[in-house]
Amino acid sequence: MATLDLLESLGVEVDFPEAQTCCGQPMLNSGCDTDALPLAQRFVDIFTGYDAIVCPSGSCVSMVKNHYAHLLHDNAPYEAMRTQVYELCEFLVDVLKIEQLPVKFPYKVGLHSSCHGLRELRLASDTERNTECFNKPRQLLEMLEGVEFSELRRVDECCGFGGTFAVSEEAVSCTMGRDRVADHLQAGTQVLTAGDMSCLMHLAGLIRRDKRPIHVMHIAEILAGYE
């Protein structure tokens, strides 16, 4: 709902096709290409014809833009559609080009960069490359009145979720997640945010289990004025 509220507040006409399903990433990541293929084709069938397809998940967007090509060979409708698929922050910065948001958020925010958003969609610069620094999610958060940012020691480290990795390598996944939470704790994070629900669900689960004093919100909720 936060994504819908946010986009409509910015004057965007939004349609939500109720026939949509999972993008198929869990199946493809598990090597089940034949199970992922009908979901990919269904996505193309449902979303072809829209001016823009916006998703509040860098992981799902990367699946559609970068990995459907593995399944949909020489598929003209897909090739035409894939250029219209945007991660939410990418859409706000690069397409709508918004410069201000009338939202107050007087909290110290810790921004987690998902691996797919960072390294496959290039929503921000990473520490592995000697390139000009940029961060589209942070650019949006900086528009909010009263916001303060946590200074993390490892700004773009993986949270450890990795989809089915969290099941097949549970101990490693949880250790990586707790490392990220510890970094936010030392930085004084009050609200931990990201653009991927998968990362947030993983980190939020560890925060609840370990009873850590950090609130978790998707970036769409913050930008839409939720508290």
For each predicted feature, which ranges?
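Iron-sulfur cluster-binding electron-transfer modules in prokaryotic oxidoreductases
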Residues: 1-227
